[in-house]
Amino acid sequence: MDTPIHVVAVVASQAGGNTDRLVGRVLEAGRDSQAGVTVTAIHLGAGPLDQARVEGYVQSLAGADAVVLGTPMYRSTYAAVLKELLERVPRGGPSERFEGPLRAKAVGIVATGGSHHHFLGVDPLIDLLVRYFGAYVVPPVLYGVIRSSGGDAPMDPGLAEDAVRFGRALVALASAIQRDERLGDARAQI
């Protein structure tokens, strides 16, 4: 029997753009992959993020079973507004239990760029999620090369298929974490 899964997507760009469209395809595939999957999308826009917005976003992340982080790549790194949000997500200190809204959750990274040259720019984000927040990152990162801006170009069929597989894998990982309490015991080491 499938357990309910709630997926929250944080999109570090404007609604309707290339990153948003690719994240949308992932969310649609995840929702369609099993009964009981619900999705919510948060658009960070250009920032800056005020404290009230950050607190609301953190509550949304805490209530999620799986998270998608969508970001365009600029100068071989992920969007500054996503970095700003993650820097303000609580995790706990050395004397605490390292609890936080991303700990032991399935997290999928969806990135877009104008070329393949920016692909490795997500590595610091993977490291942050796994080592600092104690999240389970869905491999591999979904990276889409989209050369037109504004979200009006047709999506490459191969990329669309990858997005479907990625969405299904995200929900499958979140379901596995829910079913096996040992996976939920993961803790950040530092």
Regions inferred by a protein language model and the residue ranges of each:
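Short, glycine-/small-residue-rich phosphate/pyrophosphate-handling segment
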Residues: 103-145, 161
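N-terminal beta1-alpha1-beta2 submodule of the flavodoxin-like/Rossmannoid cofactor-binding fold
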Residues: 1-98, 161-171, 175, 179-190
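Polytopic transmembrane helical bundles with strong interfacial aromatic enrichment
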Residues: 22, 146-153
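A short, mixed-charge helix-start or loop-turn motif at secondary-structure junctions
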Residues: 9, 108-111, 152
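Conserved anion/nucleotide-ligand pocket segment
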Residues: 139, 152-158
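Residue-level detector of flexible, active-site-proximal loop/helix-junction positions
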Residues: 14, 46-48, 114, 144, ...
